[in-house]
C-alpha cells in the first residue's frame, strides 16, 4: 500500500493540458494493466525504486490502490491522494473542478497548473522532478518506464473518468429499481408508494424555484440534479431476467439500480450489474450476490450470513448446550443457499449435518416437515430454513422435547412480526441480523415520523427501513460527489464515507431527539391522546415516544451498525441469536452477543 501511495503522489502532481482523445484500444488496455495491475507493456512486472534503495515491483507499484478505479483519489493514513482522472490531470489552466478525497476535510478545487509535455511527464515519472523543476515528494518512487509504457499510461489516464457515466446529464440522473415477480402485492405496493413519495420530495427540492442549499459546494457549483426513476418489474423464471434487464437497459441506460426488492434469488440482477458495470445500490433481498459482487452494495449476505452465524454459535456451544446431532430442514428456493452455507461452515469444523428437504406443496411439505421433526431426539439441534409461509406449517405440530430449534429472520421475514404457532414460540430461537427491539425503535424514529407525515402504512419495517436508508444514502453520496458522476466513484465514495456518515447521522438525530424531548414531549403526548394512539405499541407515535425515553440511538436503520471499506460489499456482518421472552411472548430477548462469523 505504501508503494502504491508513492506512485499516487507522483501522479497527483502531473497535470497535463488537453482534452480527452481517442487512443488505440490496445494502447489504452496496456495502460490499464500498468494502472491496475502493475504490469508493463512488455508483460513484465512494473519496476521502481525509492530513496534508501527499496525496490518496488508489480502490484506494489500500481496506482489503483490509492487512486482507485475511478482515478478520483482517496486518503492513505493522513495523506490525501489527489484525483488523476482526465478532468483533473489534463485540465487546462483556469479549468477548475472540485473534489473531495478526504471526508474529514473540506472539498477543494484542483490546483491551477501548467500543462505537462510528454518530456515533462517522463521526467516526473522517471526522476521525480515536476514541471516547475522542483523535486516531487521524497517518497515518490522513480519508475522504470520505456517509451511504450509512457505512451500507454498517458493514453489510459486521458480517458479515465473523462465524462459522465451513462445515465447522467447536466440536469438529470437516471435510475431504475428492480422488483422480481416473487414479491407479494403488499410489499410491492408499499415499496412503490414510498419510492414515489421520496422521489416527488427530492425533485421538488431541486426544482429551480424551490432549490435549497443541500451543501455549500453543491449549491455553488449547481450540481444538484433531478432524479428520473423507472421501475423494472421482471416476469417469468429467473433464467430470463438477465435478458429482460438487458432490454430495459438498451432502451434506457441508467446510472445505477437504486434499491430493489426480491424474495428469492438476486443473482441474475447482480450478474447484469457486473457485466454492465452498473452499481447495484442496497436492494432489499434475502439472497444477494453469491459471487464477488463487484458492482453490488448490500446490507448483508442475507440467509448465507444467518447460516454462518448459527454454525459459529453452535460450534462454540459447550457442556449441555452443545448439540449431540446437527440437523437442518430446508424448504427450497433461498433455503438451499442457507442449508449449503450451514453445512459447509460446520464441515470445516469437522461436524456433519443431516439435511432434510421438504416439498413446496403445502400438504406434502407439511407431512414431510412433521416427519423431519419427529426424527429429532433430545439433545439435537435443528435449523429450520423455512419461509414465513412454511413456518405456519408448524401449527398443530407439537415441538419435540429437548431439541434446540432455530429459524432465520432473513428467510422467514421475522424482522417484521409474523404469526408463529403459540406452542412453538417458547422453543424457537431465531438468527436475528437486526438491532435488538429497544435500540431498533430508537434507530427508526425518523422513519416512523416520515411514514406518518405521508400517511404511508407500516407494512414491513425491515423493507421500509432499508428503502428509506437507500434513498437517503444516495442523496448524501451524490451531494458529496458534486459533479464527478462516475459509477466507480459512487462505489468508492460509499466505501469511504458510509461509516462516518452513519456516525454523523446518529449524532445529529440524537441531538434532535434531545431538543424534541425538551420542547415537544408534551405536544407529542397531547397529539397522541387526541389521536388515540398512545396505547398502540406499534404506532409511529409510540416509536417517537420510546425514542424520547431511550435517549440515544446507535444507528439509522434496522441494523446495529453499517460500514464498508475498500472492496467490501456487505455493510452489516453479524447477527444475534434471540428467542421470544417467557414473560412476554411477543418480545425478543438476546441469547448471544453480536456474532460476526
Model-assigned labels for residue ranges:
Residues 170-172, 187-193, 205-291, 360-363, ...:
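Beta-alpha junction/loop-to-helix N-cap segments that form part of ligand/metal-binding clefts
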Residues 450-465, 475-589:
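Segments of small-molecule ligand-sensing domains
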Residues 48-118, 139-145:
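Gly/Gly-Pro-rich "capping" loops immediately C-terminal to redox-active cysteine motifs
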Residues 296-300, 394-469:
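Extracellular/periplasmic periplasmic-binding protein-like sensory domains
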Residues 22-57, 110:
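Electrostatic cytochrome c docking/interface patches
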Amino acid at each position: 500500500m505504501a508503494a502504491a501511495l508513492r506512485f499516487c503522489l507522483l501522479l497527483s502532481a502531473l497535470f497535463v493540458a488537453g482534452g480527452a482523445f481517442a487512443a488505440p484500444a490496445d494502447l489504452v488496455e496496456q495502460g490499464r494493466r500498468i494502472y491496475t495491475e502493475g504490469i508493463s507493456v512488455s508483460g513484465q512486472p512494473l519496476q521502481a525504486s525509492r530513496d534508501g534503495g527499496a525496490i518496488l515491483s508489480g502490484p506494489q507499484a500500481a496506482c489503483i490502490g490509492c487512486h482507485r478505479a475511478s482515478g478520483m483519489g482517496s486518503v492513505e493514513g493522513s495523506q490525501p491522494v489527489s484525483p488523476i482522472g482526465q478532468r483533473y490531470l489534463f485540465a487546462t489552466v483556469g479549468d477548475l473542478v472540485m473534489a473531495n478525497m478526504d471526508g474529514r476535510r473540506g472539498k477543494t478545487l484542483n490546483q491551477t497548473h501548467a500543462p505537462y509535455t510528454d518530456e515533462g511527464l517522463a521526467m516526473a515519472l522517471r526522476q521525480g522532478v515536476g514541471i516547475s523543476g522542483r523535486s516531487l515528494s521524497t517518497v515518490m518512487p522513480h519508475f522504470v518506464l520505456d517509451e511504450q509504457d509512457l505512451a500507454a499510461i498517458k493514453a489510459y489516464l486521458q480517458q479515465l473518468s473523462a465524462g459522465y457515466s451513462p445515465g447522467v446529464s447536466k440536469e438529470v440522473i437516471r435510475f431504475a429499481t428492480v422488483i422480481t415477480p416473487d414479491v407479494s402485492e403488499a410489499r410491492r405496493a408499499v415499496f412503490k408508494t414510498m419510492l414515489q413519495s421520496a422521489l416527488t420530495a427530492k425533485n421538488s427540492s431541486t426544482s429551480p424555484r424551490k432549490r435549497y442549499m443541500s451543501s455549500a459546494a453543491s449549491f455553488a457549483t449547481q450540481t444538484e440534479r433531478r432524479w428520473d426513476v423507472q421501475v423494472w418489474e421482471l416476469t417469468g423464471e429467473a433464467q430470463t431476467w438477465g435478458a429482460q434487464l438487458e432490454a430495459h437497459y438498451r432502451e434506457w441506460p441508467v446510472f445505477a439500480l437504486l434499491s430493489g426488492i426480491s424474495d428469492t434469488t438476486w443473482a441474475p440482477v447482480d450478474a447484469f450489474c457486473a457485466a454492465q458495470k452498473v452499481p447495484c445500490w442496497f436492494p432489499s433481498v434475502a439472497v444477494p450476490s453469491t459471487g464477488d459482487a463487484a458492482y453490488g452494495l448490500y446490507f448483508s449476505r442475507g440467509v448465507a450470513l444467518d447460516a454462518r452465524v448459527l454454525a459459529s454459535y453452535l460450534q462454540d456451544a459447550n457442556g449441555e448446550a452443545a448439540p449431540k446431532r446437527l440437523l437442518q430442514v430446508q424448504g427450497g428456493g433461498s433455503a438451499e443457499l442457507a442449508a449449503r452455507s450451514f453445512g459447509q461452515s460446520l464441515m470445516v469444523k469437522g461436524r456433519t449435518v443431516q439435511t432434510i428437504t421438504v416439498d413446496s406443496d403445502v400438504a406434502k411439505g407439511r407431512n414431510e416437515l412433521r416427519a423431519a421433526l419427529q426424527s429429532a431426539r433430545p439433545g439435537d439441534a435443528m435449523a429450520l430454513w423455512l419461509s414465513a409461509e412454511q413456518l405456519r406449517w408448524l401449527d398443530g405440530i407439537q415441538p419435540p422435547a429437548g431439541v434446540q430449534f432455530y429459524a432465520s429472520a432473513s428467510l422467514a421475514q421475522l424482522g417484521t412480526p409474523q404469526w408463529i404457532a403459540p406452542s412453538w414460540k417458547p422453543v424457537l430461537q431465531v438468527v436475528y441480523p437486526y438491532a435488538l427491539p429497544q435500540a431498533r425503535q430508537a434507530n427508526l424514529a425518523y422513519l416512523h415520523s416520515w411514514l406518518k407525515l405521508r400517511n404511508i402504512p407500516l407494512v414491513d419495517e425491515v423493507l421500509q427501513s432499508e428503502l428509506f436508508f437507500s434513498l437517503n444514502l444516495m442523496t448524501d453520496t451524490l451531494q458529496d460527489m458534486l459533479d464527478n458522476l462516475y459509477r466507480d466513484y459512487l462505489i468508492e465514495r460509499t466505501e469511504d464515507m458510509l461509516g462516518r456518515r452513519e456516525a454523523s447521522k446518529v449524532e445529529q438525530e440524537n441531538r434532535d431527539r434531545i431538543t424534541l424531548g425538551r420542547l415537544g414531549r408534551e405536544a407529542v403526548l397531547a397529539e397522541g391522546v387526541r389521536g388515540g394512539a398512545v396505547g398502540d405499541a406499534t404506532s409511529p407515535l409510540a416509536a417517537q415516544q420510546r425514542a424520547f425515553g431511550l435517549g440515544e440511538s446507535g444507528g439509522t436503520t434496522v441494523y446495529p451498525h453499517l460500514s464498508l471499506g475498500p472492496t467490501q460489499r456487505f455493510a452489516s456482518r453479524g447477527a444475534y441469536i434471540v428467542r421470544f421472552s417467557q414473560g412476554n411472548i411477543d418480545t425478543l430477548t438476546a441469547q448471544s452477543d453480536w456474532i460476526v462469523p
